[in-house]
Amino acid sequence: MKNTILILFTAFIALLGFFGMSAEALADPIADPLAGPNAEADPEAIKWKAILDAVKKVIG
């Protein structure tokens, strides 16, 4: 029973992530996909991109 709940919860979170990213892409359809996140479409994405870039820099 615990495994079933865990699997369903994980699938739910994965779907939220997928549709969340799709919604961001739909919010700014003319944006260049290689340009990075658009601050107007998702201001929080800029913060996460900066954190990810810093982690990549530290790791190498």
Swiss-Prot record:
GO molecular function, one term: toxin activity
Keyword Plastid: no
AXPX repeat intervals: 27-30, 31-34, 35-38, 41-43
Propiece span(s): 28-45
Region forming the signal peptide: 1-27
Disulfide bond positions: none
Residues with the Isoleucine amide modification: 59
One annotated Gene Ontology cellular component of this protein: extracellular region
Tissue-specific expression: Expressed by the venom gland.
Domain of life: Eukaryota
GO biological process: chemotaxis; defense response to bacterium; innate immune response
Chief site of localization: secreted
Keywords: Amidation, Antibiotic, Antimicrobial, Chemotaxis, G-protein coupled receptor impairing toxin, Immunity, Innate immunity, Mast cell degranulation, Membrane, Repeat, Secreted, Signal, Target cell membrane, Target membrane, Toxin
Location of the protein in the cell: Secreted; Target cell membrane
Family: Belongs to the MCD family. Mastoparan subfamily.
Purpose: Antimicrobial and mast cell degranulating peptide. Has broad spectrum antibacterial activity against both Gram-positive and Gram-negative bacteria (S.aureus MIC=32-64 ug/ml, S.xylosus MIC=2 ug/ml, S.alactolyticus MIC=12 ug/ml, C.koseri MIC=4 ug/ml, E.coli MIC=8 ug/ml, K.pneumoniae MIC=32 ug/ml, P.aerugiosa MIC=192 ug/ml, S.choleraesuis MIC=32 ug/ml, S.typhimurium MIC=32 ug/ml, V.parahamelytics MIC=16 ug/ml). Affects membrane permeability of E.coli. Shows hemolytic activities on sheep, chicken and human erythrocytes.
Protein known as: Mastoparan-A
Originating species: Vespa analis (Yellow-vented hornet)
